[in-house]
Regions:
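Conserved RNA-binding domains used in RNP assembly and mRNA/RNA metabolism
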Residues: 1-71
Length: 71
């Protein structure tokens, strides 16, 4: 998946409060709702709220993402 496609899916999901499934380059999977997508060179990450974990937010490097799909 291209970087532009990854940003497109994450941006859509972030703007519409939709869950995504992310597969990283090391084949780990994360499912959650994006709360922020930061493409600035000093951050370059997406923040996700895992499903059912309203008090938890995790960050993933955009460079570590291989695939994103809407859930």
């Amino acid at each position: 998946m291209t970087y532009e496609d990854i940003l497109g899916v994450l941006g859509y999901a972030n703007g519409h409060d939709v869950a995504v499934r992310i597969v990283t380059t090391d084949r780990a999977e994360v499912i959650g709702i994006p709360t922020s997508v930061d493409t600035h060179i000093t951050a370059y990450e997406v923040y996700l709220r895992p499903i059912g974990e309203d008090e938890t937010e995790i960050a993933l490097s955009l460079g570590a993402i291989e695939l994103v799909e809407l859930v």
